[in-house]
């Protein structure tokens, strides 16, 4: 008997969020935009999830880390509910 192979599902097209918003430079003070790149637990989302380029991912990472230093965004592990 020959085994049947499953056909692979078509690859999901990743959308570049920064490009769709028309943002060229990421600013650490723009917390509403930065929150879109942070998970519910406060971790920075990966490129495979966000669809950013390498340079854009570096900008987002630097901006998020700076915003955390300035206490504009929470660090991962800090639970806002106090649990």
Swiss-Prot record:
**Alphabetic keyword roster:** Ribonucleoprotein, Ribosomal protein, RNA-binding, rRNA-binding
Which Gene Ontology terms of cellular component type are present?
cytosolic small ribosomal subunit
Does the entry feature the keyword Cell cycle, yes or no? Answer: no
Which SUPFAM superfamilies does UniProt cross-reference here? Ribosomal protein S18
Q: Which GO terms describe its biological process?
A: translation
Q: Which domain of life is it from?
A: Bacteria
Report the GO molecular function annotations: small ribosomal subunit rRNA binding; structural constituent of ribosome
Q: Among its keywords, does the record have Protein transport? A: no
Q: Where are the transmembrane segments?
A: none
Which NCBIfam families does this UniProt record tie to the protein? S18 (TIGR00165)
Q: Report quaternary structure and partners.
A: Part of the 30S ribosomal subunit. Forms a tight heterodimer with protein bS6.
Query: Its function?
Result: Binds as a heterodimer with protein bS6 to the central domain of the 16S rRNA, where it helps stabilize the platform of the 30S subunit.
Q: Which family does it belong to?
A: Belongs to the bacterial ribosomal protein bS18 family.
- Name this protein carries in UniProt: Small ribosomal subunit protein bS18A
